[in-house]
Amino acid sequence: MSKVSVFGGGAWGRALAFALAEKNEVRIISRRDISSLLEPLNQKLKTLNCTSIIQVSHKEALDAQYFVMAIATSALREWLAVADLPQKIKILCASKGIESGSGAFVSDIMEERIAHKSIAYLCGPSFASEVVHSLPCALVIHSRNLELSREFGTLMPHFIKTYASPDVVGGEVAGAYKNVIAIAGGICDGLAFGMNAKASLLARGLVEMSRFGEHFGAKMETFLGLSGAGDLFLTSNSTMSRNYRVGLGLAKGKAINEILKELGEVAEGVITAKAITEIGQRENIYTPIAREINLIINGKNVRESSKALMA
C-alpha cells in the first residue's frame, strides 16, 4: 500500500483523496479544518474495508511516496514557493487554469520548481460529486514521462479508467479553456436559446480551444478525446459545474462578484477568460468566445453580448 498525500481540501481534492483511498494510505492537507467534510467519506471507506483519509500537517504530508496537487491555479505559484517539497518527488497535478497576469500555463508554474519528468497532469470529464459515489469515469494522465503517467494510473480505484498521454500542453489548455466555454454554455441555457444554439456554441468552442492549443504545440487528437471534448461537454451542460452556474448567473443579469459570493468556491473560468483574451491579443490567436465572456464578466450587457457569442 502506497502513501499518497493530497494537497487541497476543496471538493476535488477530497474526491481524489476518497478515490485514491481504495488502494492507498491517503493523507490530506488543507488550510482549514475539514474533518466534518471527511467524516462521510470515511464512513463510506469503512464499508469498503479501506483505510480512512486523515488530515495532517504540511510537515507530515511530506512523508509520502506520491503527491497530488488539487489547489486553485491562482494559488499555485505562492504555494510552491513555500512548500519545501522533497528533491525526489512524484506529483500528480489536478489544478486547471491559466495564471492571470503572466499568462503562464500550469506546467510552466510547476516546472519552475520541479523537473518535468517528475510531474503528471490529471485531465478529463469528472465531477467530484460523482467520484465520491464511486461512479465510473475515464480520465487522462498527461506527462512527458509516460512511465510516470502509467504509474499514477495504477494508484486509481476500480471505477476510474485512465489513459496515458504525452501531450501536456493539450491537456492543460483543454482543461483550462473548457471552463470558459462552460460559462458560455450556462449563459446560452440561462437565456433559453435552445439546443440548436447550444450545439453550435459547443462545436465552435471546441474549434476555438483547439486552435489556441495548436498554437502552443498541442495535438488536435487531445481536443477530440476525454481531456477536450469529453470535459467540455460535461462541464458545459450541468449545474454540478461551477463555471456553468456562473454563466446561469450572468444570464440573469447578476454581477460577477455576487455570483462568486453565492458559489463560495473558485470558478477558474472567470480568471481564465481574462488570461486567454490577453494571450490571444498578444499572440494574434482568434478567441471570440473567450473574449466575449471576458467582456460580459467585466460588465457588458449579456443580451447584447449574446449576439456576438452566437455569431
Curated annotation (Swiss-Prot):
Sn-glycerol 3-phosphate binds at K96, G124, S126, K178, D231, S241, R242, N243. InterPro entries: 6-PGluconate_DH-like_C_sf, 6PGD_dom2, G3P_DH_NAD-dep, G3P_DH_NAD-dep_C, G3P_DH_NAD-dep_N, NAD(P)-bd_dom_sf. The keyword Oxidoreductase applies. The keyword Signal does not apply. It is an enzyme of class 1 (oxidoreductase). Its EC number is 1.1.1.94. Keywords: Cytoplasm, Lipid biosynthesis, Lipid metabolism, NAD, NADP, Nucleotide-binding, Oxidoreductase, Phospholipid biosynthesis, Phospholipid metabolism. One of its GO terms (molecular function) is NAD binding. The active site is at K178. Its main location: cytoplasm. Pfam families: NAD_Gly3P_dh_C, NAD_Gly3P_dh_N. Signal peptide: none annotated. NADPH binds at W12, R31, R32, K96, A128, R242, V266, E268. GO terms for cellular component: cytosol. Belongs to the NAD-dependent glycerol-3-phosphate dehydrogenase family. This is Glycerol-3-phosphate dehydrogenase [NAD(P)+]. The lineage of its organism: Bacteria, Pseudomonadati, Campylobacterota, Epsilonproteobacteria, Campylobacterales. The gene is gpsA.
